[in-house]
């Protein structure tokens, strides 16, 4: 949230569509792998966790066009098969957007919490791919 409020990332995070706190597992589709966050992750769909009251991403039409033109949409909410449908959008985020990059793709803001999904005992270790990938980029 601080990334949008300080304008390091475009748009805003609004209160969730149904005005409630959401805490659950979701699936996200990786939309851009040309960055240090996702470039070596083999999977295209990750199971991650969300826990927020204000996670409803919104931006202007011009900002959305710019995000698309510059390939800045990082991840979107989807189902297990990767379909980005309304039913998979937990908070009402514009076009199922779960995370975006800045233009240089060195700043990532996303609603899902990969740190909460780093062990199979937590139902998924998909979050570990995210952190392992970042570590690999520094080697």
Tell me the role of every PLM-derived stretch.
Residues 1-35:
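Cysteine-nucleophile active-site neighborhood
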Residues 38-139:
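C-terminal and late-domain segments of enzyme folds
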């Amino acid at each position: 949230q601080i990334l949008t409020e300080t304008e390091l990332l475009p748009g805003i995070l609004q209160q969730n569509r149904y005005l409630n706190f959401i805490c659950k597992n979701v699936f996200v589709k990786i939309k851009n792998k040309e960055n240090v966050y996702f470039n070596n992750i083999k999977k295209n769909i990750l199971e991650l966790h969300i826990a927020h009251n204000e996670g409803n991403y919104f931006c202007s039409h011009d900002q959305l066009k710019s995000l698309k033109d510059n390939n800045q949409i990082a991840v979107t909410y989807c189902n297990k098969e990767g379909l980005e449908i309304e039913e998979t959008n937990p908070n009402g985020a514009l076009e199922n957007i779960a995370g975006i990059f800045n233009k240089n793709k060195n700043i990532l803001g996303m609603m899902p919490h990969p740190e909460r999904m780093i062990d199979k005992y937590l139902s998924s270790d998909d979050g570990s791919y995210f952190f392992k990938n970042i570590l690999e980029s520094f080697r």
